[in-house]
Structure formats: structure tokens, C-alpha cells
Amino acid sequence: MSFRDVLERGDEFLEAYPRRSPLWRFLSYSTSLLTFGVSKLLLFTCYNVKLNGFEKLETALERSKRENRGLMTVMNHMSMVDDPLVWATLPYKLFTSLDNIRWSLGAHNICFQNKFLANFFSLGQVLSTERFGVGPFQGSIDASIRLLSPDDTLDLEWTPHSEVSSSLKKAYSPPIIRSKPSWVHVYPEGFVLQLYPPFENSMRYFKWGITRMILEATKPPIVVPIFATGFEKIASEAVTDSMFRQILPRNFGSEINVTIGDPLNDDLIDRYRKEWTHLVEKYYDPKNPNDLSDELKYGKEAQDLRSRLAAELRAHVAEIRNEVRKLPREDPRFKSPSWWKRFNTTEGKSDPDVKVIGENWAIRRMQKFLPPEGKPKGKDD
């Protein structure tokens, strides 16, 4: 359930590059396959790769096409090389067309800092995402909602009194050419996290901005959790003097373990989406019914709904960590957004027993590209 203006902004964001062009599509698929091939060569030559539950992802992709629904995968964020290396653990047969290449979100200040990188990552189907104060109501999130919305369901956008609108379908060409709904992969923590023992392989809280993709897509996406370990051994955050040195492979022979979990129950997703629909009916702006009202963006009920759904997603990823991988239980503090905000604000002094390897990039002071002034009020998630 989405708003017309959200879908249109998603289209506009995707149209920043000529994604319908045959040349772009060829270069995009070639870039993705080349990156996949080089990553696969590195992993299977230098490391001990273990992939568990691949059949669950394969089945989810088949369901996505059969049921005309987007696919969303959700994973913990251990290192700067999680993407693309995680996809190199998968078999070649999965990537038989550009439609099977995942879309992902990448930090604007890292992946899009110059024209060459911007084109490279855009060809690799990465969406530029800004952090620190921009918040979840930005182009990459709108674009992800659009990608998860099948092209033939755009008339399912919300309008007052359940009226059906087909404005987007008139003389309309989608910003991308595809034969089925897209696959969007997210790292809901927003930042890499590597902690010293006994807290290794733990997660931050999940930012609620990514829940917009589930709540606002025209049809409920299939949501698959993934938990991975080992990539932090390839790219350790302990190397802080150079980003290039940080991503240079090390610890050859280490185990890389990627475990794919069961999709979230459709009834669970539907329950959250029904709550969202209720809030939309209650708080839409009669003067601008085609877009999110301030209450739907920043209101207490809307934020609570997104926060609960984000916690639900985290719990499903943590379940793989705890019940399938049998790793030591996470410290219960780590699932609390308020704990992390206090920990980041005090730069770790609030809980000195928790030590971050390298820099804690969630601390605003560490982001040199930012101006010194504080974040705009009401946009923090």
C-alpha cells in the first residue's frame, strides 16, 4: 500500500540513469557478472566457504515470480565487503539474467563520492543512500518501494475512500525493464559492526527506515532473513589508516558462513501492513492525499509501528544466529535503539565493557564529510 507521489519519486530516482537503454542493461549485467566472478574466485580459492539454506532463497525467488511479489532479503552487516562477497557464495545458476541481480543500498559518501564510482555502483544496481540526518524519507527508499511494487499493480496505490487511481498507468514506461518484480537486499543496521570478544558477531538495532519497503510496496514482499559470519576476517575494521588497505583480503583459510533462513510468515507481514493501512486512513492529509502526511512520517503511532516491525526483522535474523548457527547469545542490550544511541552519543563511555573494533562509524564526529551542525529535527531513525 503506497502513495502515488512516493511511487513517482521512486521512478524519478531510478530515472537518474538510463536504465532502459540496451547498452546500460548490457553493461549492468556485465558489471554484476564480472564482480560476481572475481569475488567467487577470491572466496573459493582463499577461504573455506559454507552456504546453508540456499534452497530457501531459490524457492523465494520462484515464489516472487509466481506470486508477482517483490523479494526483500535482510542481513547483518559485518564488513565493507559483505556486498558483493555474500553473493559469490551462491551458485552461478541463480544469476542467469539481469532480473535476478539484487538491488541494494550503498552509502552516498563512500560508493558515490565521484563520477566513476557512482556509475560503477549504479551499474551494479546499488542505490545511493545518504545517512546522518537525511532520514528514511529519501530517494533510495522511495526507489526501493517502487522496485518492490510490480509494474502491473501501480493502481493499488492508496487513495481516499478506497478509490482506485490509475494515473501512473496512463502512457507510462517504467524506469527499468523487467520480467518480474525486483529483489532488494538491505543491511538494516546501517553501519558495519565488529566488536571485540565476548560480543563478536553481534548486531546493532535495525533502523526503521527499511520497514517502509514492507509497509508501502503495492503488494507485500517476500522477506527472507540472512545471517553471515567470516567477512569481518577478510576486511577487518582494525585497519583504520586506509580504506584500500582495509578491504585487502587477509586471514586466508578462514571460514565464511552464510546461512539463509525461512521467509517471514505472510500473515505476520499482512498484520503490520493492515496496521499501516489503518494509520493511513486515520492520518492522511485531505489537502494532499497522494503523499505521506507529517503524521504518517513523524507521528508517534507511525514511528512505533515501524520500530516494532524493525525489531521483528532483527529477531528473525537473530534467530538464525542463535538457533541455527548456535552462537553464544547476544547481549540483550544490543537490540535496544536507546542503548545504541546512548552508546554512540557518549562514544562508548556509557558501557565501557563493549569495545568496537576500529572506528564506530555511527558516531557523527567520525563522518568527516558532514558539517558540524546537528541533524535536522525529527528525521533521525
Swiss-Prot record:
Q: Is Mitochondrion among the key words of this record? A: yes
Q: Name one GO molecular function term.
A: 1-acylglycerophosphocholine O-acyltransferase activity
Enzyme's top EC category: transferase
| UniProt-annotated location(s) | Mitochondrion outer membrane; Mitochondrion inner membrane
Intramembrane spans in this record?
Answer: 26-47
According to the record, the residues making up region (Required for membrane insertion) are 215-232
This protein's UniProt keywords: Acyltransferase, Lipid metabolism, Membrane, Mitochondrion, Mitochondrion inner membrane, Mitochondrion outer membrane, Transferase
A Pfam family that the UniProt record links to this protein: Acyltransferase
Q: Does the keyword Metal-binding apply?
A: no
Q: Which residues lie on this side of the membrane: Mitochondrial intermembrane?
A: 1-25, 48-381
Enzyme Commission numbers on file: 2.3.1.-
Please indicate the residue ranges that the annotation assigns to the motif HXXXXD motif: 77-82
The terms describing its cellular component in GO are:
mitochondrial inner membrane; mitochondrial intermembrane space; mitochondrial membrane; mitochondrial outer membrane; mitochondrion
One GO BP annotation of this record: mitochondrial respirasome assembly
| Known catalytic reactions | 1'-[1,2-diacyl-sn-glycero-3-phospho],3'-[1-acyl-sn-glycero-3-phospho]-glycerol + a 1,2-diacyl-sn-glycero-3-phosphocholine = a cardiolipin + a 1-acyl-sn-glycero-3-phosphocholine; 1,2-di-(9Z,12Z-octadecadienoyl)-sn-glycero-3-phosphocholine + 1'-[1,2-di-(9Z,12Z-octadecadienoyl)-sn-glycero-3-phospho]-3'-[1-(9Z,12Z-octadecadienoyl)-sn-glycero-3-phospho]-glycerol = 1-(9Z,12Z)-octadecadienoyl-sn-glycero-3-phosphocholine + 1',3'-bis-[1,2-di-(9Z,12Z-octadecadienoyl)-sn-glycero-3-phospho]-glycerol; 1'-[1,2-di-(9Z-octadecenoyl)-sn-glycero-3-phospho]-3'-[1-(9Z-octadecenoyl)-2-hexadecanoyl-sn-glycero-3-phospho]-glycerol + 1-hexadecanoyl-sn-glycero-3-phosphocholine = 1'-[1,2-di-(9Z-octadecenoyl)-sn-glycero-3-phospho]-3'-[1-(9Z-octadecenoyl)-sn-glycero-3-phospho]-glycerol + 1,2-dihexadecanoyl-sn-glycero-3-phosphocholine; 1'-[1,2-di-(9Z-octadecenoyl)-sn-glycero-3-phospho]-3'-[1-(9Z-octadecenoyl)-2-(9Z-hexadecenoyl)-sn-glycero-3-phospho]-glycerol + 1-(9Z-hexadecenoyl)-sn-glycero-3-phosphocholine = 1,2-di-(9Z-hexadecenoyl)-sn-glycero-3-phosphocholine + 1'-[1,2-di-(9Z-octadecenoyl)-sn-glycero-3-phospho]-3'-[1-(9Z-octadecenoyl)-sn-glycero-3-phospho]-glycerol
Topology in the lipid bilayer is annotated as: Peripheral membrane protein
SMART domains on file: PlsC
Q: In which pathway does it act?
A: Phospholipid metabolism
Q: Which family does it belong to?
A: Belongs to the taffazin family.
Comment on protein domains: The HXXXXD motif is essential for acyltransferase activity.
Q: What PANTHER family does UniProt report for this protein, alphabetically?
A: TAFAZZIN (PTHR12497:SF0), TAZ PROTEIN TAFAZZIN (PTHR12497)
Please explain the role this protein plays, according to its UniProt record.
Answer: Acyltransferase required to remodel newly synthesized phospholipid cardiolipin (1',3'-bis-[1,2-diacyl-sn-glycero-3-phospho]-glycerol or CL), a key component of the mitochondrial inner membrane, with tissue specific acyl chains necessary for adequate mitochondrial function. Its role in cellular physiology is to improve mitochondrial performance.
- What does the miscellaneous comment read? Present with 1340 molecules/cell in log phase SD medium. The enzyme was named after a masochistic character Tafazzi, once popular on Italian television, apparently due to the difficulty encountered for its identification and characterization.
The name under which this protein is listed is Tafazzin
Query: Species name for this entry?
Result: Saccharomyces cerevisiae (strain ATCC 204508 / S288c) (Baker's yeast)
Encoding gene (name)? TAZ1
